Amino acid sequence: MFSGNLKKQIMSIKQYEIWIADLNPRIGTEPGKTRPVVIVQTDLLNKIPHPSTIICPVTTNVKENTEILRIHLKKGTARLNQDCDIMLDQIRAIDNRRLIKKIGTLPNDVIDRIKENIEIILDL
């Protein structure tokens, strides 16, 4: 499952970047497969480096009328190759060895929406 090593654990990860991650094995309703994820963990932890990272998975199974639980990304945003949704309701921590490679960084307008929606979802 993990092909990571010590070098991979100390890689540079920044909040609101999109990375490819191996989310297998999945359990129940968790998203699995190798897929893009958004790093939502604070850079205070990302700089340590912390051994795990809080992420939101990204899916190509785009849904309508999910303004709070999902944020739609158009093809080309942060170098994504198709339309996608960030699944904010699937926020979770993963071991850094699941992270494979960085794809891109989200624009400020999407970052602002992520912050607002996570505040609503978690009642912060």
Residues covered by each model-derived region:
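C-terminal terminal-subdomain/extension
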Residues: 2-11, 76-124
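Feature marks short, surface-exposed loop/turn motifs that line or immediately flank catalytic pockets
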Residues: 27, 62, 94
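Compact nucleic-acid interaction/catalytic patches
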Residues: 30-34, 38-75
